[in-house]
Amino acid sequence: MRRILWTAVLCAWLAAVPAGRAAAQTAAAEPAKAADITPEAKAPVEAMCAFLAGKKTFTFSVEINEEQVYPSGQTVQLTRFADVAVKRPDKLYSRVTGDERDREMVYDGKTVTMADYDRGVYAVVDAPPTIDAAMEMLADKYGIVAPLSDLLYADPCKTLLTNVRTGDCVGVHTAGGAVCDHLAFTQKNADWQLWVEKDKTPLPRKVVITDKNVMGWPQYAAVFSDWNMTPKLPADLFTFKPGKELRRIELKPLAEGPAAQGGGHE
């Protein structure tokens, strides 16, 4: 699992996130080592990856509950909601709202636009011609992670299982209103769980990550809903039109210092 959740979206240029989580998401891959994943865990996750990989267009919603640990040691939980639309190979849309968050990301095959409505700003960067390449560029160049990006790649398992050390099936449990295979995986800096629907549509229904890099081991939980594998998407969904309330800013690569600076250009 490399970048499965929304935690770091826009954080490099608009808002801070817990240092341990950000470091975990941008760290280099661990040295290659054969993962100890049982067949009972491997089969459901591979079925899910194959199912998602075979879909050119789909949408889903997510409820995200994230624990944050304050310097005092106190833990608080924030709740957010995300709507995501994918049109392979070169279109991606997401909108996240909720506690301390109102953000939008639009990828049209040529550029990625990221807007923060709370702060009244947006940025546009040139992007490669595929979703996979665009997400890699954002992560490597800007430290920005697309929402639930592991599940959006053309081959989800290629990134989802990166750095996994062990994997097992906990049992058959319910998540998101569906009967699922409940899977548990470990990595050096995180434990994570995945609920995959036991059906002809092996969709991810829930993800929970425990961050072992941060004091108190905070958790990040995402429950999926409203999967639509044959959506009729609006023609203008992947065209960003900034409102008058938004001011364009410059997004600078990580190597150039501060990620964002205010700008007056349109």
Spans of model-derived segments:
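Flexible, processing/modification-adjacent segments and terminal tails
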Residues: T26-E46, A53, A115-C180, F185, ...
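Gly/Pro-enriched, hydrophobic low-complexity segments
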Residues: P39, E63, T113-M114, A123, ...
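Signal peptide processing junction and immediate N-terminal pro/mature segment
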Residues: V17-A29
